[in-house]
Regions:
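A charge-rich, low-complexity, intrinsically flexible signal that marks solvent-exposed coils, linkers
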Residues: 1-109
Length: 109
């Protein structure tokens, strides 16, 4: 199944779990997501209770941070800056930020 067709309520908790396994918190994952995509905590909570897809989550982000395009690195062996599909790039950027958070790296806002 395509990531964009999967339910947000199924995918996002996996990001939270990844961070929590390394001693980070749900609120820290929310904070990174809010910075990246412009959602409020309340909006993220509502999405977790909704039938929204992960594609909806990415496509309808209220305020994508333009600085996100400066984020570089690898996720799953793929260089983020080489990803041409803007939707997939945003997915991978969020994944990278959560990975960095889980590894204890400082997330510069």
């Amino acid at each position: 199944m395509d990531i964009f067709e999967m339910k947000f309520a199924k995918v996002f908790p996996l990001l939270i779990a990844k961070a929590e396994r390394k001693g980070r918190t749900r609120d820290e994952v929310f904070k990174v997501t809010m910075w990246l995509l412009g959602y409020t905590k309340e909006e993220l909570e509502a999405l977790l209770e909704s039938e929204a897809t992960y594609g909806d989550f990415i496509d309808h982000a209220p305020a994508k941070n333009p600085v996100r395009m400066d984020i570089k690195g690898r996720i799953c062996g793929i260089k983020i800056e080489d990803i041409e599909d803007p939707r997939m790039r945003d997915v991978r950027i969020l994944d990278k930020l959560v990975d960095d958070l889980a590894k204890g790296k400082e997330i510069k806002q």
